[in-house]
């Protein structure tokens, strides 16, 4: 698909919830492919502002209403898993006999138009995807992308020029949409139960990731851990032994991102090269790291050992896609993080640095704070807004333990998203605050339920040299932005 070819010309797509990171990207891609697009959301966002500025669409902002759905019998109404069936715009679509399209279905269509690299895993999808985009761009491969956050300075969460061969997407397990994608290269970063409403057990989750990997036609990039390598599909008789998968006389080598790869079956009638990766003992610096990959030194400007792992996964996927290794590495040198992934927003009035992060699982909170600790010359202050009552109830103790690693922890009430408080009696952010206080053994923990409660306390609390990390998948980024007086252009 190269300009001026626009295969979706004549289609009319209406996006319900277009202000989100995912849906706004699909609207942008559909517009680039020639479709007429419209959208609505309850609140304006940076994404609706960018869509308007770029001439893609002017979203209707406010309560969802049937009047938002354009006239015409050919309109397709696209919705995400966060939009319930009783949403007025979905109800109107059904009453008018319009086509209702789940977000996952549209993404599957998009992946059929390109050779697709799909990044899956419980943690690290957005950062790994953003790094991969930067590596492919630096190598001259002109990728398109649909990512859950901006991929870097001056770049958006989605880009679709139609001039390159590759599309980079996140493969979301929360609604099993990863199982509908057309995948050439699959990346699997890790597996941990997070979406309890979708998966009843870890074994059920693992089977879903196994099915995802079976969709890969060209390559599988997987963290070199036995429990993940065990999910890699292979011909009958293949055996997973420790960190190496044995296929006849050949091995898929483990060993820290140096996997040589071997041809094994990965789905009916397909073959994929399997590449395990790792990044052992990166040298952590003030806000970055150094490590060696395939004989090259890699320098990152994002903190934490987890980001060295993300970068290694991205580099291996880029290599499989045809990128020259040194050019791909150069593309990561100037990467300072994806949007809402340890994103420096600016400084407070007293000179504290304020970061925004999407962490909403204990493992993510712990990794984010470990990375932030390398930057904190004074106190590390963690501000956390839990996301979903169900997750809070299941993981309160684990969240508390992670937050206790900060010098000061501030816990807000739950951002409910699609859940209702009455369905989860007795569950609030206070459960996490109490768990953090127990784990902190006397360290300061604040329970400040609302953004309005937290703002004045934090403004008074922050001091020069502090690092304040505001975490959560809800609207807590609004609080983070109110804490700064000089921004970082974010």
Predicted regions and their residues:
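Nucleotide phosphate-binding/pyrophosphate-handling subdomain across enzymes
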Residues: 3-14, 22, 29, 33, ...
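Conserved N-terminal Rossmann-fold NAD(P)-binding element of oxidoreductases
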Residues: 13-18, 471
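Walker A (P-loop) phosphate-binding motif
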Residues: 15, 29, 103-151
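Short internal beta-strands
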Residues: 35-42, 219-224, 381-385, 405-418
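NAD(P)-binding Rossmann-fold cofactor-contacting core
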Residues: 36-50, 143
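Acidic, Mg2+-coordinating active-site environments of NTP-dependent enzymes
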Residues: 48-52, 69-102, 108, 112-114, ...
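Glycine-rich, highly charged phosphate/nucleotide-binding loops
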Residues: 52-70
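C-terminal helical cap/extension that packs against the catalytic core
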Residues: 54, 400-464
